[in-house]
Swiss-Prot record:
This is one of the proteins that bind and probably mediate the attachment of the 5S RNA into the large ribosomal subunit, where it forms part of the central protuberance. In the 70S ribosome it contacts protein S13 of the 30S subunit (bridge B1b), connecting the 2 subunits; this bridge is implicated in subunit movement. Contacts the P site tRNA; the 5S rRNA and some of its associated proteins might help stabilize positioning of ribosome-bound tRNAs. It comes from Fusobacterium nucleatum subsp. nucleatum (strain ATCC 25586 / DSM 15643 / BCRC 10681 / CIP 101130 / JCM 8532 / KCTC 2640 / LMG 13131 / VPI 4355). InterPro entries: Ribosomal_uL5, Ribosomal_uL5_bac-type, Ribosomal_uL5_C, Ribosomal_uL5_dom_sf, Ribosomal_uL5_N. The keyword Protein transport does not apply. GO terms for cellular component: cytosolic large ribosomal subunit. This is Large ribosomal subunit protein uL5. It holds the Pfam family Ribosomal_L5. Part of the 50S ribosomal subunit; part of the 5S rRNA/L5/L18/L25 subcomplex. Contacts the 5S rRNA and the P site tRNA. Forms a bridge to the 30S subunit in the 70S ribosome. Belongs to the universal ribosomal protein uL5 family.
Amino acid sequence: MDKYTSRYHKFYDEVVVPKLMKELEIKNIMECPKLEKIIVNMGVGEATQNSKLIDAAMADLTIITGQKPLLRKAKKSEAGFKLREGMPIGAKVTLRKERMYDFLDRLVNVVLPRVRDFEGVPSNSFDGRGNYSVGLRDQLVFPEIDFDKVEKLLGMSITMVSSAKTDEEGRALLKAFGMPFKK
């Protein structure tokens, strides 16, 4: 049985790596930056009042990523937010290997173009080590989500962790994948 290789994984091997080696003047193929994981996080602060919201967030993340999310709980109590330690406040999925490449493919080619008034993702959201984070205002930009079944619009943050050592390397990697940065 042949192992499944996603379209973007093949694209990385055949197009992105040679392009990055030339652009970043890398001699050894193992030095070429690569994506290690993509973390999709949904913070649901209103879950303190309405516990059904966390279930909706978990279901939406499962549909979007194809993987069961991890329930995130409050680390300590905070009276100002009516929050007790151990209360569920979010959901998180860590994507690796083929699911990661499939998700990136859908994000770049389907989801981001569906965002209203989209002019590109901000190019200043790098962390100094080549990792990139972008936020989405609602989950409806994903075609898998049924508009009629959504109770509340929930935003999410998507973090792409790469082996790049600098922001320039990380930007070059994501640009080679087709990430539409603002001019």
